[in-house]
């Protein structure tokens, strides 16, 4: 209740409060942005529904991740064009990523190659 209509100088992002489209109505007026993580939404399909619904109500989108390999991160790249922020650094936090993993260079994530999928 403390966030209702709070006038923040920076957008407040709902992370663990937002898992699926069902959560959005409760966030309106409290948050200006949501963090979409495919691990939370249950996969790419629900993440796409959530992103579209958030756009419809004027919420900004961040695409984030848990610590995971490039194989888990690659589908999230498909949401990148809808997001104001991307935080897909999960593979960088691992000692060893998958062979043929995503390439990170100069702040950019390169799209996956067919070899990533096995």
Regions of interest found by a model, annotated:
Residues 2-3, 7-89:
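Catalytic alpha/beta core domains of metabolic enzymes, predominantly
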Residues 66-118:
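Flexible C-terminal active-site loop/helix
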């Amino acid at each position: 209740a403390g966030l209702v209509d709070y006038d923040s100088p920076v957008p407040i992002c709902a992370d663990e409060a937002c898992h699926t489209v069902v959560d959005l109505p409760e966030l309106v007026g409290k948050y200006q942005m949501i963090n979409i993580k495919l691990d939370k939404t249950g996969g790419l399909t629900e993440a796409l529904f959530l992103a579209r619904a958030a756009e419809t109500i004027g919420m900004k989108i961040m695409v984030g991740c848990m610590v995971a390999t490039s194989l888990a991160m690659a589908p999230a790249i498909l949401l990148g064009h809808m997001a104001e922020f991307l935080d897909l650094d999960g593979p960088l936090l691992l000692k060893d990523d998958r062979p043929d993993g995503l390439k990170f260079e100069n702040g950019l994530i390169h799209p996956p190659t067919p070899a990533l999928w096995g």
